[in-house]
UniProtKB/Swiss-Prot annotation:
It comes from Haemophilus influenzae (strain ATCC 51907 / DSM 11121 / KW20 / Rd). Its EC number is 2.5.1.-. Keywords: Transferase, tRNA processing. Signal peptide: none annotated. GO terms for biological process: tRNA wobble uridine modification. The gene is cmoB. It catalyses: carboxy-S-adenosyl-L-methionine + 5-hydroxyuridine(34) in tRNA = 5-carboxymethoxyuridine(34) in tRNA + S-adenosyl-L-homocysteine + H(+). InterPro entries: CmoB, Mo5U34_MeTrfas-like, SAM-dependent_MTases_sf. This is tRNA U34 carboxymethyltransferase.
Amino acid sequence: MIDFRPFYQQIATTNLSDWLETLPCQLKEWETQTHGDYAKWSKIVDFLPNLHADEIDLKSAVKSDRTSPLSEGEKQRIIHHLKQLMPWRKGPYHLFGIHVDCEWRSDFKWDRVLPHLSPLQGRTILDVGCGSGYHMWRMVGEGAKMVVGIDPTELFLCQFEAVRKLLNNDRRANLIPLGIEQMQPLAAFDTVFSMGVLYHRKSPLDHLSQLKNQLVKGGELVLETLVVDGDINTVLVPADRYAKMKNVYFIPSVATLINWLEKVGFTNVRCVDVATTTLEEQRKTDWLENESLIDFLDPNDHSKTIEGYQAPKRAVILANK
């Protein structure tokens, strides 16, 4: 099982120390209610070898390697373990010559977001809905002091810990398996990311308020979410599914999204990027047995989802507390 005590020790002398009032009890409770496969997944992490990487690149990729390459047998054993943690959704990872080609080219998103951010050097960062942690490692690569990701999905936690193990057990990033609604308001993070989460929230304004409560005064919010074309009065509420996803509730226009952020008290709200999701960015690979974007679009008109809605388009909004 994954041990969170090193994280408790890390934050004990930081401005996150107040979290220790609630977090250990929450995670003890979490351990009693985990997914039935969690024990198996965490053992897979244990089975991975303790390799020392001579080269780690988190600035331009998430990559580890060493001067003496692994044998083919060693590579195949690691691939076998990692594939037991499928599906791998967000990546890619390059680990000791093994290319973990995930469903999403999350480096594409990072390249869109990064140029607009306040420098991450020395910052304490929260990544809400972090998945398996790809962007967390890229934040570390930009010089973040500490990156905390939260995501309640046990598989993502085990994928994150597997990658960490193959990155010399780097402790600058940590994944906590909780949702933001379970976090006490810490007002302790310099930057808070919420990417690909808002449209899954039944109450989007509550989510925005929860993000604000985690920021220091003047801190920066990085919000990336699905949007639709339209004016300040435009919000899509899918009747049933959107792109085959049943847990999509509100997809606003950029103007509506900016209005929401201002309504909950954010300042300096600005849209810095809008991009339609491409079949190069989200696609099937050998590391994903499920359907992907091509299956979610109208086969005769890729400008629409299979349900007839506008195809996925994502905006990046920055704001300050």
